[in-house]
């Protein structure tokens, strides 16, 4: 079988498509023929930063894939022919995240799924929603589950609440779709008017171009009558966090997810304390959360937004497109 491998720290163009032996599942494991992968920004920076991260070579990239079970080990309830989707963390079945969970991320700490056949623990996959194709299901493990986690904990968004979504990346697009089925209003920021129009078509209540309106937090306050939003899906990091704190209401929630504006910066904790804001770090989610999300997807017949589908042998192009940041929705690799 064939698998893409990170074999050096030389970036996307150094990825190698190599031959590997077809893996055999041990007890408690399943072998999955991958029909599709989707890529995340995290996958791109893992490849680009493989040397600095001291990644073992070779490493198969990607956390998100969907396909069909082709073999099972002893003690497994799944059957050959079952459709399944990978879980980002192999060992986060339920409950709180811990150090052992963090060490079980696919496509980084553990081998990823950009291969024709992969072996995963049975608890590291989840049945694919029947309403989705494998290409659509492959978009769920990271971006969709991150958005779901940010909107459901420490408590679920309530119908009628207002949620601020920063940017129009994969997490924010899924968050918009989930807010629509939850009955929540949204305010969306982006530097692209075209992408804002697309978010409006998905149900966004208000849109703000932060390039032409750099003090976008003041506009959010104006749109909410001065009270602020109930929740923020914060993907920017240090460059946007203080404005997010200003834009959220007293007693509101900020789901802190990304660092798209960088990894360094200073934050004044006083407004967080003064407004009794809950700031929750969000790093994808558990298999139990995934199951809850899939039920919502099935019930509402939600369809992930896919921008482009690339052939398996042209996987490098998918990462270059991710780096270009012109896409709206997910980038998928079809085996």
What are these regions (language model features)?
Residues 1-65, 120, 211, 320-323, ...:
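Short N-terminal strand-loop motif that marks the start
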Residues 162-168, 180-243:
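Adenosine-nucleotide cofactor-binding segment
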